[in-house]
């Protein structure tokens, strides 16, 4: 049927006066880097969060596909496990809209046993550690680890310059 995507959701866009695409809801689509990904990496989730809880946060966004959680053991003896979270969208523009809307979103403000940093979503575009990941002002200062990517916003915070 014309105007509908494979999954039955209506697919439409409008061109704005400056020829930029207008995304869903009439909002201009954000400018995207050429290597933009449709997958977001979420950090700051509590160790006991579930896939269902994270899905509940992202489900209202157009293009949401799925959440993948990976539990990793702590690098420190006796430390809490670390949760890696990846959220997939249909396209990079939809991922960017969710990223901008939820940056710094508080997920668990009652969990007193959680460290102060835990419970605040910090989102980044998921990308291979081989490449650079624009986090703040399109600058990435550090790649750490083989498959993970930690981003530091200033050179002073980074001890492993990767550029």
Swiss-Prot record:
Domain of life the protein comes from: Eukaryota
Family classification: Belongs to the MEG family.
Protein name in UniProt: Protein MATERNALLY EXPRESSED GENE 5
PROSITE patterns registered for this protein in UniProt: RRM
Disulfide bonds: 140-162, 143-151
InterPro entries the record matches: Meg, Nucleotide-bd_a/b_plait_sf, RBD_domain_sf, RRM_dom
Organism of derivation: Zea mays
Positions of the RRM domain: 38-117
The keyword Membrane appears for this protein: no
UniProt note on tissues of expression: Ubiquitous.
Any Pfam family the entry gives: Meg
Protein keywords: Disulfide bond, RNA-binding
The keyword Disulfide bond is assigned to this record: yes
SMART domains associated with the record: RRM
Molecular functions per Gene Ontology: mRNA binding
